[in-house]
Amino acid sequence: MPHGKAPQLFYILDKLINEYGASTLVYESIDFGVHKSQADSYGRFVGVIELIAFNHQLDIECYGPKHIKRIAAGIGDASKGQVIESINTKYGLSVTDDNEADAIAIYHTYMEALCRMK
């Protein structure tokens, strides 16, 4: 995330939380083999997440890509296409964008973990 995007992300998340409410922020971690510029952007992203969570007194949960893919598609090294196909099949959707599929997969990963805790 470029430096200028962090305030925009903060504003969007703050507005969504104020409008719809939340108890937990859930996001996907990155793999360790990423390029330095990606790691820098990710660090800014996590900083925004932590600040928003602190301001709104929210819990934070983070899941690795392989875990999310395993929950979504049944295998930890699923391709983007496999995740999209699995999300559409499991939930009767017609998602075509991999970012949307990832968001749905992250949500369901969290919900599965939450159900296991109860």
Regions found by a protein language model. Give the residues of each.
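Phosphate- and other anionic-substrate recognition elements at nucleic-acid/protein interfaces
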Residues: M1-K118
